[in-house]
């Protein structure tokens, strides 16, 4: 991607160190190439993995860092070879903004598994410039890694679908978890988990929410539409539910035992890990081999699957439960997210902050 224009300066909210505190930061966007679109950010969701990156929990963070990978905005400019989008269209940008495009994963429409994928932030572009995310006024993104927001999908509702939504949609499609009437467990009811309930119900599955307490029971059943609720600390109820589920999607992002949940699976059942847990998890093998059960993993989704997720949710009228906040509230929102004090996703109204004025 060659340089075609002079540099442009934008403002975002960046972390300067592992304290994770976000404050205004002015920086230069990379130059627009022939296949790039410039996106003026309108909304950006907050993901738990933003906390992981901001606080350097994986030991790979670079600062200054502008987080945000659930980006919804409007196209303001396009490169000379862009055919996919027009100026004025509403678009989304998810977790990755680049890949090698030549490996088996890229050729198989699985860009998220490319070993040379480029993260939306805390990474390096092909031209050597750092990537910065959606807590900013604008972004420059290759058209291949941009998706179209359906007209009947509210923009603020679309933001969480770009990470949380596709994170559950992709394994459901890949592992065949779409047959109406099958029984699916959702372990953990946070940002990803609540989208798991909604998308699973839209596919016609019988959904059981599994949580460590009953404090979300009423909301899970009456608001999100789950069919059943299981408290993992209730040994009697867990025993009664043994071998009752076809699948479980595990969305918990911290260390936890797997054995209680493997015991809930029927023969041939699947436990699909979706949470990023930076420490070992333990289980005994008889729980797998005596029921031909399997543990699998899935990571976000491809660009094709991301567009499918948006289109599916627009068609089925699946919406995320969000709390819209301003950039001036973002540090408080992060503190609340640490305490799990959000139902169920924060979405930042970036446009209302008038960052470049």
Swiss-Prot record:
Gene3D superfamilies: Medium-chain alcohol dehydrogenases, catalytic domain, NAD(P)-binding Rossmann-like Domain. Zn(2+) 1 binds at residues 47, 69-70, 163. CDD domains: CAD1. The keyword Ion transport does not apply. InterPro entries: ADH-like_C, ADH-like_N, ADH_Zn_CS, CAD-like, GroES-like_sf, NAD(P)-bd_dom_sf, PKS_ER. Keywords: Lignin biosynthesis, Metal-binding, NADP, Oxidoreductase, Zinc. Its EC number is 1.1.1.195. Binds 2 Zn(2+) ions per subunit. Pathway: Aromatic compound metabolism; phenylpropanoid biosynthesis. Involved in lignin biosynthesis. Catalyzes the final step specific for the production of lignin monomers. Catalyzes the NADPH-dependent reduction of coniferaldehyde, 5-hydroxyconiferaldehyde, sinapaldehyde, 4-coumaraldehyde and caffeyl aldehyde to their respective alcohols. PANTHER family: ALDEHYDE REDUCTASE (PTHR42683). Belongs to the zinc-containing alcohol dehydrogenase family. This is Probable cinnamyl alcohol dehydrogenase 7/8. It comes from Picea abies.
